[in-house]
Amino acid sequence: MFWLGKDSKVFRFPLSFFHFPLLPDFKIAYDEIIFCAKLGSESGAYLAYVRNSISDDSCKKNSSERFFYYLCGIMEQVRAKKALGQHFLTDLNIAQKICNSLSGGSAENPDNVLEVGCGMGVLTQYLLRRDDIVTYGVDIDTESIAYLHAHYPDFTPRLREGDFLKMDLAEYFPNGVKVIGNFPYNISSQIFFKIIEHRNLIPESVGMIQKEVAERIAEKEGSKTYGILSVLLQAWYDIEYLFTVSEKVFNPPPKVKSAVIRLRRNNTEKLDCDEQLFVKVVKASFGQRRKMLRNSLRSAFGDFHGAEHPFFTKRAEQLSVADFVELTKWVSDNR
């Protein structure tokens, strides 16, 4: 059994009592559900135990637990999990503003959009109302997936339970996809590295992240916060810092302010250098950002046969994207 809350009353219902679809991958016939709800609770505390014909205890426990989370879909809210970096947006005006920040196609030729971390669908509901986009979703949280299945049944065929960072975007979206979301704080940087990796598939992204990360991404050379993500994203995308979001509009509230930024792929189809080497040069340069580039790059690529570049007396934060392109070409010729 799985308990949530106290002071509950127990009811027994046949499975046919519940008028919502089962998850598409359920293979088990459930005979009866013992359902326990805390009456009068705004959040709705639930207990669910699934009785079926499976004899293997471990299989029964796993299947029961999954169905329990599915039942949680009729709860008023999903529990935010610190381990997943979840801070659920509660302000509908902010959600609509984020939705409106993403460009679309047309009703006749809508763009594919992937929402990363759908949570309880606060942003999802506005995306689904647009006829110039087709919205897909991915979320690693079983409880959130259950909630979305129950509250947005028409969204179910386009909703995937899984890790965006491990998702094969080329397989699911061979013609490209725009990415949007209230990105989980603990993987926001990793999400942007994945966008860089799949830049040929992702023409645009709108994301809500920590304010300090957003500022760092939009920063120009010469600043102490200018770093790897700044250079790599600005090499292929135009960055717009759209607006700041108060910590008070989240549940639970984070300890820092958030911000929404927009990335739109620029006209640079290909850099005028080896792009894989460009990424390595940028990462190596900022790997020891307090040192001059001479030391940082020689640690990564060798002594360049004694050759020197004028940039060697500078630090990584002093170089623009164009400077890094030039430096990459030099490294390619001299290593």
Say what each PLM segment does.
Residues 6-13, 39-41, 58-67:
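Positively charged N-terminal leader segments that act as targeting/secretion signals
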Residues 28, 33, 52, 61-62:
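Polybasic, lysine-rich low-complexity intrinsically disordered segments
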Residues 66-284, 322-329:
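Catalytic cores of RNA-modifying enzymes
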Residues 284-335:
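C-terminal lobe and adjacent flexible extensions of AdoMet/dcAdoMet transferase-like proteins
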